[in-house]
């Protein structure tokens, strides 16, 4: 391709050879030899690519000349940086000096020791700051309030400040109790479901717990026997199991309440004394036989004769209810008395008993924890009742 940029107008666009003023070519000087960038005439006849595409511009550049801008070649030049502003200084400037106090607070300059003592001579100010008969030369002491109760609030300026600590505790206290109650409620509601899962797992030892009612006349999708839909045959059995579980939980709470009432001395339970056929509960006027030892819990009055006197026997309250149940059951089921020697013998083997308990806890501990973990939320409730009731 030719490199001559100053050919003698082979396509006839212009009457002159070179019109680019860069090499002093104009109508007065049509000679194109001033352009040093030229080749021989056969190379100049070759068509080059220019601003109008291949074959539309001669090798000397097209309609506007041979310069790169005329041929459509754009050259990006770096923009000159803007001139530095004359009203801007680089770096952190020092803080200007504060104006003097006499300029910013002229009223403060009016108060000096002389002005202050002169102000104290005012009876209104003197009555607020100085006691009756006091001098203004000494230290200013607050005076006790001598106003009447009806006018005591008039001396206060503005509303009293709110105690944010009391307000915060007033809001946070019930909120924390509500949150703890909701947490315990949600945990307690999982107790029947956990016990139901344990109950149904006894029927699927080593297998998958799948409801057996899904292949009946009204088939349902695969589901656990603890979550049967109402259309499943096992739905009524699930309700029966949960009803029994709720009764068991209520019985457990009732037993704990009875033991708690007995521990607090609110449930006078009197065991049967050997050789006596009558028992009584409640207070007695006098005791024919004083209580043995000292006890912080109320004694139990038993064997009430006809004269109104009774024998007071101190009963450990934590064992009173259990002992009462044992004696009540032994009086009606004689075969229970045969278990007493066996229990005494078993308790006498203390090392063996402890080793057995340790072995059972080591072997059954994880499974027992998974079974009894739903009952853990009941422990704070029982502890609260035990302490505060």
From Swiss-Prot:
Record's GO cellular component terms: membrane; viral envelope; virion membrane
Lipid linkage positions (N-myristoyl glycine): 2
Biased composition (Polar residues): 85-95
Keyword field: Acetylation, Caveolin-mediated endocytosis of virus by host, Fusion of virus membrane with host endosomal membrane, Fusion of virus membrane with host membrane, Glycoprotein, Host-virus interaction, Lipoprotein, Membrane, Myristate, Transmembrane, Transmembrane helix, Viral attachment to host cell, Viral envelope protein, Viral penetration into host cytoplasm, Virion, Virus endocytosis by host, Virus entry into host cell
Domain-related comment: The large envelope protein is synthesized with the pre-S region at the cytosolic side of the endoplasmic reticulum and, hence will be within the virion after budding. Therefore the pre-S region is not N-glycosylated. Later a post-translational translocation of N-terminal pre-S and TM1 domains occur in about 50% of proteins at the virion surface. These molecules change their topology by an unknown mechanism, resulting in exposure of pre-S region at virion surface.
Gene: S
Pfam families in alphabetical order: vMSA
Official protein name in the record: Large envelope protein
Higher taxonomy: Viruses, Riboviria, Pararnavirae, Artverviricota, Revtraviricetes
Localization per Swiss-Prot or TrEMBL: Virion membrane
Region annotated Disordered, chain positions: 76-102, 133-154
Protein's organism: Hepatitis B virus genotype D subtype ayw (isolate Australia/AustKW/1991)
Job description of the protein: The large envelope protein exists in two topological conformations, one which is termed 'external' or Le-HBsAg and the other 'internal' or Li-HBsAg. In its external conformation the protein attaches the virus to cell receptors and thereby initiating infection. This interaction determines the species specificity and liver tropism. This attachment induces virion internalization predominantly through caveolin-mediated endocytosis. The large envelope protein also assures fusion between virion membrane and endosomal membrane. The middle envelope protein plays an important role in the budding of the virion. It is involved in the induction of budding in a nucleocapsid independent way. In this process the majority of envelope proteins bud to form subviral lipoprotein particles of 22 nm of diameter that do not contain a nucleocapsid.
